[in-house]
């Protein structure tokens, strides 16, 4: 008996994350890509812009009602912050059963939406058809902090450095290689969206200082943690090993991980555990690819979870 594929569409596919999503969908044995919306690329063949996709599908310029009318089983919104609402409203009105995954920050604080960081929240998934994908920095911070969350004596301080792909494709100083050359660009040093996101999700205040670097992809997150009780390096290392023992995408390493080694891969490396004299302050380093585990890979994990498939299907 032939099993009908699950149909899926992407809105906002011109960006770097959209390109990664297309590759993952093309590798998924149970998904069929039925539309890809991009105003800038409308009319062009998807295969001309994606190495992993083979077929005659072309980009279309679709408004919210047109997306809803496509009646896809799954829709992924890969739009800038503040742009998702019309698409959500149109799908809610005509296709509420659609599985909708939003990669922007628009619904991360909405309790009606499942917040999908599988390694930390999959136990709370209860069949929701609306899934909010976490931020890239926010993913790194939460994974680095969680094993010691109950031991915290104060707000974690998080120094984040991202490749410039994290600034999107719309030209700006933060994705201009000429301005970033030999440079490190601090921005939004208080009250960043991901600072608020992590503080809300973990239930503890977090202090976050983001920077953009000249490399294209990958995040390094260095986290300073003050502890209520002294812990040795060995005890701290053991807590991380225990917490993530059954998480295939998370690797606990001894040395501080390098972003160049994580770029282009689906997982997270956490390591570099360094304890200050007195054993009540520890520094932890996490690295991940902002376009993959920070966006597209995580969306695919959430999709697989919601549809009852192996969470790592298509994630090679």
Curated annotation (Swiss-Prot):
Localization per record: Cytoplasm
Protein name, as recorded: N-acetyl-gamma-glutamyl-phosphate reductase
Stated family: Belongs to the NAGSA dehydrogenase family. Type 1 subfamily.
NCBIfam families linked: argC
Keywords: Amino-acid biosynthesis, Arginine biosynthesis, Cytoplasm, NADP, Oxidoreductase
Gene this chain is encoded by: argC
Catalytic site: 136
Recorded superkingdom: Bacteria
SMART domains xrefs: Semialdhyde_dh
Purpose: Catalyzes the NADPH-dependent reduction of N-acetyl-5-glutamyl phosphate to yield N-acetyl-L-glutamate 5-semialdehyde.
GO cellular component: cytoplasm
EC number: 1.2.1.38
Any GO BP annotation: L-arginine biosynthetic process
InterPro entries: AGPR_AS, AGPR_type-1, NAD(P)-bd_dom_sf, NAGSA_dehydrogenase, Semialdehyde_DH_NAD-bd
Catalyzed reactions: N-acetyl-L-glutamate 5-semialdehyde + phosphate + NADP(+) = N-acetyl-L-glutamyl 5-phosphate + NADPH + H(+)
